[in-house]
Amino acid sequence: MSTYAIGDLQGCHAEFEALLERIAFEPRRDRLWLVGDLVNRGPGSLACLRAVKALGDSARVVLGNHDLHLLAAAWAGAPLKRSDTLAPILEADDRDELLDWLRRQPLLVRDDELDAVMTHAGLPPHWSVTQAAEHAAEVERALRGEAVGDFLAAMYGNSPARWTDELEGIDRLRVIVNTFTRMRFIAADGTLDFAAKEGLDSAPEGFAPWFTYARDDDPRIVFGHWAALQGATPGARVRALALDTGCVWGGALTALDLVSGEYHVEPAHASR
């Protein structure tokens, strides 16, 4: 049995299917980890969502910022942007089934046998794996609860930008969401930067990539989100495995065998 971690799909369904063929994926034998952002920007968002859901227990998924945007559009009426490719999902006959499945996916997956933790954007140095799992569970309960629409309507925002244990209510949940799904550069005190989205040379003064801070524990951290890294984490002081290689932007879709350490790459089928 192999376990493959795959980067951001973002609606690149043709490349996803080709990558599964490339690795000879067998759902009765193998397992997939998907780092989130299954949907948006690419042309096959609906097909990606259906395909991953159909894999059942063979696939483990964490939510990304684009997945949460889809849920906010569905439950809280969040407006779609011109670049969004989410309308086919919202208009699909099976939308309710797909969206209910999506909102029940976690923000963090942990497997001690594989010595790996997966989140969409990474793992901040000031949270242990246990603390991160506890914080993820707080948001997961909100997403699965009856007041999911109220939560999603209040989820957006950049404030507060720094975690403290004293945070309560929506402020607490918003920082957790932003940490798991939007984090790139952070300050030594844990403050998140939301402006810089390019490579490492775009770091604001006083900020550094989250993976350049040492941790007390040292799990393998599987993440996506940051396409500008192109799979590299220079200066890392943790075992960070970057898997978003920008398929939706004309790059590639990448799979990592978490057992053998072998990478498999499917080039984008079209530049966008």
Swiss-Prot record:
Keywords: Hydrolase. Hydrolyzes diadenosine 5',5'''-P1,P4-tetraphosphate to yield ADP. Its EC number is 3.6.1.41. Pfam families: Metallophos (PF00149). This is Bis(5'-nucleosyl)-tetraphosphatase, symmetrical. It comes from the Bacteria. InterPro entries: ApaH, Calcineurin-like_PHP_ApaH, Metallo-depent_PP-like. Belongs to the Ap4A hydrolase family. Gene3D superfamilies: 3.60.21.10. GO terms for molecular function: bis(5'-nucleosyl)-tetraphosphatase (symmetrical) activity. It catalyses: P(1),P(4)-bis(5'-adenosyl) tetraphosphate + H2O = 2 ADP + 2 H(+).
